[in-house]
Amino acid sequence: MNFIAGEYDVAVVGLGHAGSEAALACARLGLKTVGFAVNLDSIALMACNPSIGGPAKAQLVREIDALGGEMAINTDKSLLQIRTLNTSKGPAVRSLRAQVDKKLYQMNMKYTLERQENLDIKQAEIVDILVEDNKVTGVVTKLGAIYKCKACIITTGTFLKGRVIIGDVSFDSGPSGLFPANQLSETLKRLGFKLMRFKTGTPARVDKRSIDFSKMEIQPGDEVITPFSYMHDKIEIEQLPCWLTYTNKRTHEIIMANIHRSPLFSGEITGVGVRYCPSIEDKVVKFPHKERHQIFIEPEGLNTYEMYVQGMSSSLPEDVQLEFLRTVPGLENVRVMRPAYAIEYDCIDPTQLKATLESKKIEGLYFAGQVNGTSGYEEAAAQGLMAGINAAMKLLNKPSVILDRSQAYIGVLIDDLVTKGTNEPYRMLTSRAEYRLLLRQDNADFRLTELGYKIGLVTEERYQKFLKKKIQLEKEMRRLLGVMIKPSEEVNNFLISKGSTPLVTGVDLYTLLKRPEIDYKSTKFLDKNRPDDILDSVAEQIDINIKYEGYIMKQLRQVEHFKALENKKIPEDIDYYQIHGLSNEAKEKLTKIRPTSIGQASRISGVSPADISVLLIYMQQLRRNKEDEEQIG
């Protein structure tokens, strides 16, 4: 029998990476919030890799942090190792990647949720969503408890009708042996949502004591740790190494000899898998001429012998897994602690959502994370934060917060999902961002902290810290224009030592720093009046802003054109089938997606430049008609 168990402003269903950010955002903005997890020990569960960040993902984490989210802070608290990737490439693609202690990450996030004012967390499976007059009014647990709410955020990850597959064995399950959420999937279907079936997988976890690391290449962390969060200036820990090894011909032979036992190729798995994170059997089949594949051995935590075998995700039978693992140098005597598995799950077609991540069908119902067809902890957390912010803004009668593609990777992520949709698990890539030189991990605070402060998530402490950095950067950039460097033996010897051309005439230091081989820190001895308190992060900004000034200005001009199209708003009630000249496909797609601007309409698959021209002419006619009516009136 059902009973009223409580009344809240917001209910968050699922407390993984998306749900944790959503719940914290709502509670911190003053809304009475309740969060549900099938098991409270699964909060912020890292069901796959023990790492945060990497290309494009690090940018997301920094953006979450700049807006006042939790992921970066929690990563720094749980750190085992950190490295900066792509250091030999340009700043647009440089990114941090942190190895974290999985259990510590979960415990820290759970404690953060427990301590948060306005937030209750409960262990329960949500099976139904209550709707009246097309508005969310509550959620129902498996035990019949009704929690009334004005907004609900669905962040169920891979739990919806989860099914684990290992060889010819399959069973209903969420990730890591947790219960699946089967009834909620049926509820969403009943409410009219189109569901898709996706698949992901995870590699085996092996016993550290059974590994011969002498046959592998050590992968240490950076000598100087760069924190993920802008709130942390320094982190001092003894870092744990990762290890690199490779598959070989024998590994591939075993996989191919047993490929008929792979559910991926037998038809047992019907869900669409992750393109950019293929299983080992997928790699061997698709790249038959490749002699070896990289395998990284990563620690799962400080207080465990479990090691994560990155690059060997598989759904082959357990006996085959052990056989091919033992062909890898260093793993000849390996003991498997947890076998690799694939997991299929339901997710929604994200084109059913607005850019706020609110459902177009039901008011007050939001979706975030893997349930929207994405993959990755970082992508989930970013969506969770924005869904939480927008649910709160709506209930507080404040304007929605929609980041555009020129502001943040978060904007690219959400725009791609709601405009284009996805037919496979969506992963954030730097190549997806048109303005990636503007959307670097080093400047996320400059892009988003003031917005986060205006929203109410950025604390006064964080805001003052940011302002100090901003003022210091602006003052130092101006000062460098007035620092004259004259040719001298000392100066020219320095330039020659850096592989740079000697000076013939004097030049300001700002101009000298445009040379790629000269960095700001190395010129301190030439700059007698340089302040002693320049932050490392400011020094980094100076180098990037000066060296890439021309490219940055070019992208800013491109953004002006982009903004012009984004600012051409399309009326909500427009009937595309009444517009003569639009192709039938465009009418269908525009009606389904209902873009809010010409810019968004132009990014919809199936809408051609000719269709956009027709739409622009139609909107000009609408505007003229409105002006004529106003003059007559």
From Swiss-Prot:
Lineage runs:
Bacteria, Bacillati, Bacillota, Clostridia, Thermoanaerobacterales
The alphabetized list of GO BP terms reads: tRNA methylation; tRNA wobble uridine modification
The record's section on InterPro entries has: FAD/NAD-bd_sf, GIDA_C_N, MnmG, MnmG-rel, MnmG-rel_CS, MnmG_C, MnmG_C_subdom, MnmG_C_subdom_sf
State what protein this is by name: tRNA uridine 5-carboxymethylaminomethyl modification enzyme MnmG
Q: Which GO terms describe its cellular component?
A: cytosol
Q: Which domain of life is it from?
A: Bacteria
Please state where this protein is localized.
Cytoplasm
User: What organism, scientifically named, is this protein from?
Assistant: Thermoanaerobacter pseudethanolicus (strain ATCC 33223 / 39E) (Clostridium thermohydrosulfuricum)
Keyword Glycoprotein (UniProt): no
- In UniProt terms, what function does this protein have? NAD-binding protein involved in the addition of a carboxymethylaminomethyl (cmnm) group at the wobble position (U34) of certain tRNAs, forming tRNA-cmnm(5)s(2)U34.
